[in-house]
A protein has these predicted regions:
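Extracytoplasmic/secreted proteins, especially bacterial periplasmic and envelope-associated proteins
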Residues: 4, 17, 21, 25, ...
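Surface-exposed patches in mature extracellular/periplasmic domains of secreted proteins
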Residues: 26, 34-39, 50-54, 99-103, ...
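Extended amphipathic alpha-helical interaction segments
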Residues: 59-154
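N-terminal Sec/ER secretory leader and immediately downstream segment
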Residues: 1-62, 195, 201
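Outer-membrane beta-barrel domain signature
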Residues: 53, 58-66, 70-73, 77-78, ...
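Second-shell loop/turn segments in exported
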Residues: 7-13, 22-26, 37, 72-75, ...
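Soluble non-cytosolic domains of exported or imported proteins
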Residues: 12-17, 29-32, 45, 79-82, ...
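A cross-kingdom marker for long, charged
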Residues: 138-201
């Protein structure tokens, strides 16, 4: 891939542009009042407390989280606590979005590897070639997300964890996240189409 193609790749997959296109797609589903309702939920004191706990995990470079994960096999969490984390993960679509993004990035990398050899695949063929990765990515994402949540929220009472999950179970928030899951593959596919088009020039 030459420098011009590298620049096109950077432009196509820039986070700001991806987020903007996602927002445009979602704008057809949500009116301003509903968006304000969702924003209010995600900016609530409960949500802010959990966001702060998540950010704190990275303050030591993730060393404590890595140590915690190493101990999980010998010291598994209480079943009811794990169930709450799984409820939150399901409501927030965290594992689903994480595995989806990893899969779409992997598909793009596979396409770039083909293009570097002068080959290419259309979107359907690329999906068939990479489909076997999806299950493994899903399993590893679930494991990573659950262990992260168990560690990040370890000092949060279960009642607060349940309240946090309930925020994501509100209909407007749930619909927003479901639409994100639906739209993201389309946005990545559109960007891969641009890469194919650029490679033919």
């Amino acid at each position: 891939m030459n420098k011009r193609q590298q620049a096109q790749l950077g432009d196509a997959f820039a986070a700001d542009g991806l987020c903007l296109d996602l927002a445009r797609q979602l704008a057809d589903t949500f009116d301003q009042a509903r968006l304000q309702q969702i924003q209010g939920v995600l900016d609530s004191p409960v949500a802010q407390r959990f966001s702060e706990a998540e950010r704190a995990v990275g303050e030591d470079g993730g060393a404590a989280l890595a140590s915690y994960r190493a101990q999980l096999a010998q010291r598994p969490p209480r079943e009811e606590r794990l169930a709450l984390v799984q409820r939150l993960d399901g409501a927030a679509h965290t594992s689903e979005l994480a595995s989806l993004l990893r899969y779409e990035v992997g598909k793009t990398q596979a396409l770039l590897a083909l293009m570097a050899r002068g080959d290419s695949l259309d979107e359907q063929a690329l999906s068939r070639q990479t489909a076997s990765q999806a299950t493994a990515l899903r399993a590893s994402s679930v494991e990573a997300v659950e262990s992260f949540m168990l560690y990040a929220y370890r000092q949060m009472p279960s009642a607060q964890l349940a309240a946090y999950a309930a925020l994501y179970e509100q209909p407007a928030v749930a619909l927003l996240l479901e639409r994100c899951v639906q739209v993201l593959p389309q946005l990545f596919a559109e960007r891969r189409a641009l890469l194919r088009k650029a490679a033919k020039r």
